[in-house]
A protein has these predicted regions:
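Auxiliary Fe-S-binding modules of radical SAM enzymes
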Residues: 71-180
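Core AdoMet radical
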Residues: 1-72, 161
Length: 180
């Protein structure tokens, strides 16, 4: 298809917890990296992801992704052809850490990446409310607005933001593995 002029970028969607050695094997194969950057707070990383080293692993992984993909490139229709979009999902009660993530990404990468600041955290009935009561609620709209305002105050120009009312179960795909 490429030989006949058809081009579809290869997008690598990841939670951000990737070994640099693994990413190096993808060098030249991936056009757009779409990692999460969940936390800079190691206590949150340990508690919610059982990976206290998540912040350092994710930092190194994102650096490698940016090295490979370079600055964002768009076609004449505005579709991204190359680049990195780092997603950050604001969690309930984690605004301070969200601000630290945004600041780190902006100071480290500036306009070499896009950020996607997400507000759609949705508590699920299956979440152990006794174990994580602080996560058994949606992110208040004012908290998300504070995160967006903070990004703007830093000078972040390349970011996607969400409109309200995205924290619904209808936005969560069914993870049934049916058809796999």
């Amino acid at each position: 298809a490429k030989e006949q002029g058809m081009y579809l970028p290869v997008v690598y969607n990841t939670g951000g917890y990737e070994r640099v050695e693994t990413l190096k094997m993808l060098d030249g194969l991936v056009d757009i990296y779409l990692p999460d950057f969940k936390y800079l707070n190691t206590d949150h990383a340990k508690k919610y992801s059982m990976a206290e080293d998540y912040p350092e692993v994710a930092k190194a992984a994102i650096a490698e992704m940016v090295r490979q993909a370079g600055k964002p490139v768009f076609d004449e229709r505005g579709m991204m052809k190359r680049g990195v979009i780092v997603r950050h999902l604001l969690l309930p009660g984690c605004l301070a850490d969200g601000k630290r993530v945004v600041k780190y990404l902006h100071e480290t990468y500036g306009n070499r990446i896009y950020m996607s600041l997400m507000s759609q955290y949705t508590p699920l009935e299956s979440l152990d409310a006794a174990k994580y009561p602080e996560l058994n609620r949606k992110v208040p709209e004012y908290a998300y607005e504070k995160l967006v305002d903070y990004a703007i105050s830093l000078g972040v120009m390349q970011a996607f933001i969400q409109e309200g009312d995205t924290a619904k179960e209808s936005f969560i795909p069914p993870f049934t593995l049916e058809g796999v």
